[in-house]
Amino acid sequence: MPRSLKKGPFIDLHLLKKVEAAVEKNDRKPVKTWSRRSMILPQMVGLTIAVHNGRQHVPVLVNEDMVGHKLGEFAGTRTYRGHVADKKGKR
């Protein structure tokens, strides 16, 4: 169920301060964050945000299509290594 419109989008305050500082300085360095639950706002477009996936920070270049989504959607947490091959092979 999506968040109520009267509440507005959720974003952690420490991330919002980092984003505003990066926009003000026109800084191109990635903004490092652990906040996967924060929503992508229009002022983040063009920034690179390094989102933590549990092991490392994954750089996410924010574009206009990502606005309204959560940061965690773009940094996968699980690695798929494929199914184990059958030793006997297919008959």
Swiss-Prot record:
Record keyword rRNA-binding present: yes
Domain of life assignment: Bacteria
Database matches in PROSITE patterns: RIBOSOMAL_S19
Keyword entries, A-Z: Ribonucleoprotein, Ribosomal protein, RNA-binding, rRNA-binding
Gene Ontology molecular-function annotations: rRNA binding; structural constituent of ribosome
GO annotation (BP), single: ribosomal small subunit assembly
GO cellular component: cytoplasm; small ribosomal subunit
InterPro entries in alphabetical order: Ribosomal_uS19, Ribosomal_uS19_bac-type, Ribosomal_uS19_CS, Ribosomal_uS19_SF
Entries under HAMAP family matching the protein: Ribosomal_uS19 (MF_00531)
Function: Protein S19 forms a complex with S13 that binds strongly to the 16S ribosomal RNA.
Name of the protein: Small ribosomal subunit protein uS19
Organism: Ectopseudomonas mendocina (strain ymp) (Pseudomonas mendocina)
